[in-house]
Structures are given as structure tokens and as C-alpha cells.
């Protein structure tokens, strides 16, 4: 046990590597096509692309520039985005949201255990990781990793960009909270792979927002504080911006604090009120909770602009309609401790950056939750009356910055972005365990990345031939209070008295904030290295490959569903257009023989009845039915046009079309 626990004792310090900055513009320029920027949010996601000298934030198929990070399964299909969120109240157990709060975490994490009690879907333990169990079509139970669900959302953003750009997209910059740890970053990268994307770079959300703020800012050096309070996570980053150089001085945050927690407090308030007023406990009624969750979010948003809102829900329980007021003062009281909690990371980041309050030139607000007046007031008070800058769109700034970074990596940014340099930092201290369970720090928090540090250690026992390298992240002095990232053994060390062998341990953090560790016996040159895979936390390559295959199958199924709906719509459109054509006096009503009219009307009536009875027919069946109806109607219509001298098929005034194949709105 001693050998494993006390693998090393500090003999001499050899700091081989030093911090080095980097120019992202030079990297991977040749290989990449257009690189989109994706803000993969807890509650909403957003995608942008740099095009024609500026960033375009891309609207989805519903015309919205942000898409709910929700996925749902029904008996016949998979839904993503608005479609999933809109049916949540009637299908709560099969509707998944807030998956970013699970990604890269262990099942026993206290945050996961807490969230399990709050969501209507089922979270299960698989190999120590939280997986989501849900019924997919035909009542089949399936478990999905958080990476797979995130991949579905990333896939939706990829499709949105492809529809806008009219070409396939393979590369993306994906953002993560600055305070995400190694496992959470790696899991986000894996989600990209499952979605069929090469994640060219992971960048921190506040840094991306700082680019959105500072892209066109010329002039001297400025210190900015980015306050990023989103749906599920909270970050504070302090940066210096100087003519295109963005240098992060310090970062802090809470990866489990955001708008969802504020909604939850509203829900708890109303659950108590309903219990008291109606003697009814709805805390286990997923359908009622789904309706209440939706209204709580709506009320919270409304209270940013007004002082009172009425929460009204039809038939919330037992057919009872619910209607109660909620004031801004009550909302602030319910969330007072959570709002104040945001100030802790602000103070810590300021201390780490070594700046006085008066040295912050701008406070940039990012994330929908920064619209809350109380949050703005707390910031204003802390910075002694300084007004936060509201110049960036809090919902879109992160995707905007990611798109700029994408254009730098692809080389498509041109002169506008060629001088941009990002100097980001590692958010947490990284080190290894030395004798006595001590956390020996190799890379302190807020070190500029990418970075490389080496240190020489030695053996703790005589004749020791193997050392175990245990890698941790965290700020405490003992490893038991830090988070184990992974461990590996370096064996084959020649037997020698303790303190003789020299083992060089090298930590290298790449530009994504992901850690690689190498240990080398200086005597023999034998070495071992690992990319930290968070013990059980990381998906294996086989699992990722399987999930990629399944994601492709789902995409194929989604395509089939769309084709089926299109075929149905085509048949329906044809029938209604034809009905209109033969029934309208201005069209063909008066030109048809009664026998012809009867024949057409009979065929249309029969087709409509068939449609009613065959809601879930296959694409081929709809196409076959369309051919049948056309075979009856088209010859008759053509004959009429020939008799009257009109053009066959399209109707005299271009309507009534036989070939109308537009999608219905």
C-alpha cells in the first residue's frame, strides 16, 4: 500500500517547462473547412459562423436564434429543441433537459444526487457514471450517456448551420464553462465526436464572450470582468484586452448555479402554497411539475421587466385551474442566498488577478440570468456604483466569440481576425500525490495555457521497482480533499536504494485545457504517459464508436420520419388543392361534367378518409395513394383544360396545382 500511496518524495525540483503563449491563427489551418462556433448551453444552445467579414448567428428551423437544449422521445420519433420542450408537460418522463449538469460527473457526485430528485426523467448508475434511462419508440427502454444526449443537441446545431450555409460542416469550436474540470471538457469533446464533429477547439465561455465584446475595440489596455450567469453554470473571468490580445488573468465560478436553480425556488414556493391552500401535494406529479416548471421560467423572465406577474396554469391538478401572483420582491427573497453566492467567485477572481475594484474598466454581462435586476444591483454595489456594460447580447455573445475563434482556426477570418491572440488559463491547480497524501502542485490555477511543467521525483522505499503516479486537481494541500483525475504505474525501474532513481513527471495542458501526463525514468529512459481519462468517467473508444453508430441510426430514423411527413403533406396538399379547384366557380366548378365532378369528388373523399385512418402510414403508402388519386383526377382535369383551351395541370390562374409540392407552414 505504501508503494502506491507514497510513490514519490520530492528530491530536487527541475522546472523544465515554462509558460508559453501561442498564436491560434497558425494551428491546423490547412486541414479545416469552415469552422462553426457552438455555445452548448445547459438550457439553450446557439450557433454562429464567421462569413463575409462578420459573425452570423444562425436561426433554427423555427426562426429562433437560440434553441432549447432539450431532447424528447415519443412513440414514433425523436424531438430536439423547441419541439421537445413544447411537449414536455404531456411527456415528462421521456423529455431530457439540463444534461450539461451531468456531463463529465460521477454518479455519486452530490450535485448529481440532488438533480436526480428534481428532474422527471430517470438517472441510473452505469459504471459509476450517471446515464439517462428513457423509453424510446415501441416502449423499448434505453440508457443514454450525457455525452450522447449532448451530441443530439450538437447535431441539431450542426444541421442548423448546414441548412444556412448549404454545405456539410465537419469542424466546430465548442464552448464550456471556464470552471469546467478536465473530465467535463473531455466529455464535451467526446459529445462532438458522437455528433460527427471534429471539435477543433474547446474554449471557455467567458473568454468567447470577451471576444464578442472586444473584437472591434481599439485603443489602450483595458481590464474587463466577464460575469457569465447562464441557465445552469456560473463563471467569472477577468481579462486584459489590448489591441486584439485577450489575456485571462483569473477565472472562478460554480458549475452548478444558474437560472434553473432560480426556477426551482419558484416551483418550491408554489408547491408549498398549493399544499397549504388546496391540501394537494404535486411534488411527485411529473405532469403538473412540467407545467409549473414552464410557468416558473416564464414568470422569472417577466419579472426582469415588471414588478408583478400572475402565474396562471389551466388544469394544474384534478382539473383545478391555478392562478397566483408573484412579485419581484418575493422572487428576490426566494433566491437571495443564490444571488449573493455569485459574489464569492467575483471576490476570488479579483484577488487572484491582483486588481483593485477601480482597475476594472468594464463589467460585461453574459447569460440570460444576468437580466435579473437584483443580480445587476449586487454587481453594481460591489463595484461601488459602476454600471455593467450591456453592449453584448447575453444570449448570443458566447456563440459569437466561438465563431470568431473558428474563423481564426480555419483561416477564413482574414485580416479582421489575424491579429487576435487568446491567452487562456487552467482554472484549477493540477498536481500529483507524494508521500503522506500531500498534493504536490505542478501547474497552479490561472496558469496560461497551453503549458508544460516537469519536476523530478524519486522513490520512497529501497529496491522499489514501480511507482504509481496519481494525478489530482484542486486547491487543497492534501489529495484526499482534491479530485482524483487518474493514475498510472511506471514499472521496470532498476532496484536501488531509496532516493536514488530519478523519475521526471511532465504535465502538459493543451489549448483545450485537457491534461496529458508523462513519467520517465531518467536512468533507463523508460516512460509511460496518459491523457487523463478520469478513471471510470471517460467513455472508451469502443463506447464512442458505438455511440457514433447509434447517432447515425437515429439521424437516419429522423430522416425517414421527415420523409414520411413530407409524403403525407404532399398527398394532403394535392387533395385539398384539387378539392378547391373542382369546387370553385372561378376555377373548374362550372366546366366539369357532373359525372366527372362526381368521380373526382369520390376519389378525394375516399383519399381523405384513408388519411384519417392511416395517420402513421409509411412514406411509400402515401406515395402510392397519391398516384391512385392522381390517376383518377389528372386525366379528367387535363380533358377539361383541353375542352376549354386552358393549360393542363396547373389551373387557369396557376393554382389548384397538381404539382404543388411546397412544404406547408
From Swiss-Prot:
Protein's recorded name: Heat shock 70 kDa protein BIP1
Extra remark: The kernels of the over-expressing transformant exhibit floury and shrunken features due to defects in seed storage proteins and starch synthesis.
Record-level Gene Ontology MF annotations: ATP binding; ATP hydrolysis activity; ATP-dependent protein folding chaperone; heat shock protein binding; protein folding chaperone
Carbohydrate-modified residues: 614
Gene: BIP1
Pfam hit, one: HSP70
Subunit organization: Interacts with P58A, P58B and ERDJ3B.
Compositionally skewed regions (Gly residues) per UniProt: 646-655
Signal peptide: 1-25
Motif Prevents secretion from ER, residue numbers: 662-665
UniProt source species: Oryza sativa subsp. japonica (Rice)
Similarity comment: family membership: Belongs to the heat shock protein 70 family.
Amino acid at each position: 500500500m505504501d508503494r502506491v500511496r507514497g510513490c514519490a518524495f520530492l528530491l530536487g525540483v527541475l522546472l523544465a517547462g515554462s509558460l508559453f503563449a501561442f498564436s491560434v491563427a497558425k494551428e491546423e489551418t490547412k486541414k479545416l473547412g469552415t469552422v462553426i462556433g457552438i455555445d452548448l448551453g445547459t438550457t439553450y444552445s446557439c450557433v454562429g459562423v464567421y462569413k463575409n467579414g462578420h459573425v452570423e448567428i444562425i436561426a433554427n428551423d423555427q426562426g429562433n436564434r437560440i434553441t432549447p437544449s432539450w431532447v424528447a422521445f415519443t412513440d414514433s420519433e425523436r424531438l430536439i429543441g423547441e419541439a421537445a420542450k413544447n411537449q414536455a408537460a404531456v411527456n415528462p418522463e421521456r423529455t431530457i433537459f439540463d444534461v450539461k449538469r451531468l456531463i463529465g460527473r460521477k454518479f455519486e457526485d452530490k450535485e448529481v444526487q440532488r438533480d436526480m430528485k428534481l428532474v422527471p426523467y430517470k438517472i441510473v448508475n452505469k459504471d459509476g457514471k450517471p446515464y439517462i434511462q428513457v423509453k424510446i419508440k415501441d416502449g423499448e427502454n434505453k440508457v443514454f450517456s450525457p455525452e450522447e444526449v449532448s451530441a443530439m443537441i450538437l447535431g441539431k446545431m450542426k444541421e442548423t448551420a448546414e441548412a444556412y450555409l448549404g454545405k456539410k460542416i465537419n469542424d466546430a469550436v465548442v464552448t464550456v464553462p471556464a470552471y469546467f474540470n478536465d473530465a467535463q471538457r473531455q466529455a464535451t469533446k467526446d459529445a462532438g465526436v458522437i455528433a460527427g464533429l471534429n471539435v477543433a477547439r474547446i474554449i471557455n465561455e467567458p473568454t468567447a464572450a470577451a471576444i464578442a465584446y472586444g473584437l472591434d475595440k481599439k485603443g489602450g489596455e483595458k481590464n474587463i470582468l466577464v460575469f457569465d450567469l447562464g441557465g445552469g453554470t456560473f463563471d467569472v473571468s477577468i481579462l486584459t484586452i489590448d489591441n486584439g490580445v485577450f489575456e485571462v488573468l483569473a477565472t472562478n465560478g460554480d458549475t452548478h448555479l444558474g437560472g434553473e436553480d432560480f426556477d426551482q425556488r419558484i416551483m418550491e414556493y408554489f408547491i408549498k402554497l398549493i399544499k397549504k391552500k388546496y391540501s394537494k401535494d404535486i411534488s411527485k406529479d411529473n405532469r403538473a411539475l412540467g407545467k409549473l416548471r414552464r410557468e416558473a421560467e416564464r414568470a422569472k423572465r417577466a419579472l426582469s421587466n415588471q414588478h408583478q406577474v400572475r402565474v396562471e396554469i389551466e388544469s394544474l391538478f384534478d382539473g383545478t385551474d391555478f392562478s397566483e401572483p408573484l412579485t419581484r420582491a418575493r422572487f428576490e427573497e426566494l433566491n437571495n442566498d443564490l444571488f449573493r453566492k455569485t459574489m464569492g467567485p467575483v471576490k476570488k477572481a479579483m484577488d487572484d488577478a491582483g486588481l483593485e475594484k477601480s482597475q476594472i474598466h468594464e463589467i460585461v454581462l453574459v447569460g440570460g440570468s444576468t437580466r435579473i435586476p437584483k443580480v445587476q444591483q449586487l454587481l453594481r454595489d460591489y463595484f461601488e456604483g459602476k454600471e455593467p456594460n450591456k453592449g453584448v447580447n447575453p444570449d448570443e455573445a458566447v456563440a459569437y466569440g466561438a465563431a470568431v475563434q473558428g474563423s481564426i482556426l480555419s483561416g477564413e477570418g482574414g485580416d479582421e481576425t489575424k491579429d487576435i491572440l487568446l491567452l487562456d488559463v487552467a482554472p484549477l491547480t493540477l498536481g500529483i500525490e507524494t508521500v503522506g497524501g500531500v498534493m504536490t502542485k505542478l501547474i497552479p490555477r490561472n496558469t496560461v495555457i497551453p503549458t508544460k511543467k516537469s519536476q523530478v521525483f524519486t522513490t520512497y522505499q529501497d529496491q522499489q521497482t514501480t511507482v504509481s503516479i496519481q494525478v489530482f486537481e484542486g486547491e487543497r494541500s492534501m489529495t484526499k480533499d482534491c479530485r482524483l483525475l487518474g493514475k498510472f504505474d511506471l514499472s521496470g525501474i532498476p532496484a536501488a536504494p531509496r532516493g536514488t532513481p530519478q523519475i521526471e513527471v511532465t504535465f502538459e495542458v493543451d489549448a483545450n485545457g485537457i491534461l496529458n501526463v508523462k513519467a520517465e525514468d531518467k536512468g533507463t529512459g523508460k516512460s509511460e504517459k496518459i491523457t487523463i481519462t478520469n478513471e471510470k468517467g471517460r467513455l472508451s473508444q469502443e463506447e464512442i464508436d458505438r455511440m457514433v453508430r447509434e447517432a447515425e441510426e437515429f439521424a437516419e430514423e429522423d430522416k425517414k420520419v421527415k420523409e414520411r411527413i413530407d409524403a403525407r403533406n404532399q398527398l394532403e396538399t394535392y387533395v385539398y388543392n384539387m378539392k378547391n379547384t373542382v369546387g370553385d366557380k372561378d376555377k373548374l366548378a362550372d366546366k366539369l361534367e357532373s359525372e366527372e365532378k362526381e368521380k373526382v369528388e369520390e376519389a378525394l373523399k375516399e383519399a381523405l378518409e384513408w388519411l384519417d385512418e392511416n395517420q402513421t402510414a409509411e412514406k411509400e403508402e402515401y406515395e402510392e395513394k397519391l398516384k391512385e388519386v392522381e390517376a383518377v383526377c389528372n386525366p379528367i382535369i387535363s380533358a377539361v383544360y383541353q375542352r376549354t383551351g386552358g393549360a393542363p395541370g396547373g389551373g387557369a390562374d396557376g393554382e389548384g396545382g397538381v404539382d404543388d409540392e411546397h412544404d406547408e407552414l
